[in-house]
């Protein structure tokens, strides 16, 4: 598949007109009338997709797939507007911007699997996956100046001969501007294992696990690190079930290792890490008729807590107690 994308981004920006000394530490930014902004960009991508299925025997099947996929940037990250965030005396000037020229990040994927069906409803499988991801979007910082209506550059009135008022010796106001940019690459690979065994009397068990690795993991000792993959962790699930034509009940245990949720925090610097977590759930249903079903769900039966921390294990950020939750209902299909 070949895709061509034209991007038009519209926004409204009130231009900064000057900085005024407010008190001993702060300055106040003045703004003019809002003006419309429009930017245009384009990009094209080739997205091949190839898959193959090989029946080695009646019970043994091999599968393979190679593909390229893209993930487009969010609309918020493509905003053409610059927001002034800090105007303190002494050169502490910061701002944030979107980037209308952002391109999607691309993933070249390889998936291989081998499945063995040793009974009518029982199988074991192993799979390998590898993803080469390029053009990741990360936040970067650059110096930014602002041009005024008369063509001159905005100055910082706290830097001249008179630190309390504007004068001829004032320096150009240089803001540290944070904005998203393309550029980072990463490799992710891992294995997926699965086993399902069904007994003759309707009982069965299901187990699966994922082992994942990456070359873009968080280094807790590198405070200048600006890129690491989020959401990656090992996990496994164990399910016991009983099924008949009318009844179905499942007891599921889920475990997930700790993972980086975000490279930022709601307050303060540093990453947000979700610690390893386990949960036990139950669900069941009864078919009253071919079209009506009664069901129930029990979530987090053992009332586990979610713990979020910062860079190190003693940097507690949040303990989330969602409790045990039950749901009952009726489903209809007409």
Positions of the model-derived regions?
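Surface-exposed extracellular loop regions of Gram-negative outer-membrane beta-barrel proteins
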Residues: 1-55, 107, 195, 202-210
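C-terminal beta-signal and adjacent terminal beta-strands/loops
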Residues: 255-264, 285-334
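Residues on the lipid-exposed face of transmembrane beta-strands in outer-membrane beta-barrel proteins
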Residues: 50-54, 112-116, 128, 193-197, ...
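Repeated loop/turn-to-beta-strand initiation elements of outer-membrane beta-barrel proteins
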Residues: 59-62, 121-124, 202-205, 246-250, ...
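Transmembrane beta-strands of outer-membrane beta-barrel proteins
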Residues: 1, 65-67, 127-129, 206-210, ...
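Gram-negative outer-membrane beta-barrel transporters
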Residues: 130-132, 137, 142-265, 302
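Solvent-exposed loop segments that connect transmembrane elements
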Residues: 4-39, 78-98, 140-179, 217-228, ...
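Outer-membrane beta-barrel signature, preferentially recognizing the C-terminal barrel domain
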Residues: 41, 70-125, 131-133, 172-191, ...
